[in-house]
């Protein structure tokens, strides 16, 4: 009888785990595949489809102190490593057209070398980089630790005057070339046709990303959202809380959602049923 009860309890626990590890996105079922565990607070995720490699920053303990490091994860081989050469690395972005991986550190912009698994400061700015977003047309957008917006293009770094009146923690460019930015007050849109800033709502945005078609998304601690630029609405695709709170997100080469939580990097893979 005791064995039967234990068996039933085990089945119940397994069922609960299966439910927890399955999510429904736009009416489709997805399972959670852990790509990397024991990786603390992976942040600022970006993906290089040519090399099937994910880039991010993460927190680590060194001599009882918390430090920021940059890392890479090959999604095919699950090979993980620390990127050397970046001072207090925080931000990542990928130029898929020219095959350049950009990394942001405390003292400027770096590029990644696959051969040496290291990064080199390209010497265009000494600003402390917080976040990056690459746009094929307009260049490398980035924000600084004091929440100011900039763009790097054609060898020049310029402050984005249109968005500089408000603090900018993270930013991105939409399908229609409008600039989206977020701070502690929420998410905003700078419409380049009207030169007006539009309040899109009180969302705690920690990262922007886009899929292979250029559609814009963002993550927050409580979920992952699609940005509907036509009606300026935010469509919540994933809800998470507690230890599963989302730190950042990206898309792989097949447009599967990859995101990080407190201690893992997870990919959503199609599943028949939850």
From Swiss-Prot:
<comment type="function">
    <text>Binds to an ommochrome, ommatin D which is a yellow chromophore. May be involved in guiding the chromophore through the hemolymph from the epidermis to the gut.</text>
</comment>
<protein>
    <recommendedName>
        <fullName>Ommochrome-binding protein</fullName>
    </recommendedName>
</protein>
<comment type="subunit">
    <text>Monomer.</text>
</comment>
<feature type="signal peptide">
    <location>
        <begin position="1"/>
        <end position="18"/>
    </location>
</feature>
<dbReference type="InterPro" id="IPR015943">
    <property type="entry name" value="WD40/YVTN_repeat-like_dom_sf"/>
</dbReference>
<feature type="glycosylation site" description="N-linked (GlcNAc...) asparagine">
    <location>
        <position position="183"/>
    </location>
</feature>
<keyword id="KW-0325">Glycoprotein</keyword>
<keyword id="KW-0732">Signal</keyword>
């Amino acid at each position: 009888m005791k064995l039967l009860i234990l068996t039933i309890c085990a089945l119940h626990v397994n069922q609960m785990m299966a439910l927890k590890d399955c999510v429904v996105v736009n009416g489709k079922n997805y399972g959670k595949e852990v790509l990397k565990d024991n990786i603390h607070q992976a942040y600022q995720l970006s993906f290089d489809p040519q090399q099937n490699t994910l880039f991010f920053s993460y927190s680590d303990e060194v001599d009882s102190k918390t430090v920021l490091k940059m890392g890479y994860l090959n999604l095919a081989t699950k090979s993980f490593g620390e990127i050397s050469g970046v001072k207090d690395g925080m931000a990542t972005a990928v130029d898929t057209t020219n095959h350049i991986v950009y990394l942001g550190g405390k003292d400027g912009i770096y590029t990644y070398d696959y051969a040496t698994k290291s990064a080199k400061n390209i010497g265009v700015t000494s600003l402390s980089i917080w976040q990056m977003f690459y746009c094929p047309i307009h260049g490398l957008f980035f924000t600084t630790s004091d929440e100011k917006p900039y763009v790097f293009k054609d060898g020049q770094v310029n402050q984005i005057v249109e968005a500089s009146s408000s603090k900018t923690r993270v930013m991105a460019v939409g399908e229609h070339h409008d600039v989206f930015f977020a701070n502690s007050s929420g998410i905003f849109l700078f419409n380049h046709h009207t030169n007006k800033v539009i309040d899109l709502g009180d969302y705690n945005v920690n990262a922007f990303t886009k899929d292979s078609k250029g559609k814009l998304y963002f993550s927050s601690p409580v979920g992952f959202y699609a940005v509907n630029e036509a009606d300026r609405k935010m469509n919540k695709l994933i809800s998470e809380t507690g230890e599963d709170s989302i730190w950042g997100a990206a898309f792989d080469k097949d447009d599967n959602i990859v995101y990080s939580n407190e201690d893992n990097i997870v990919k959503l893979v199609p599943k028949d049923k939850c």
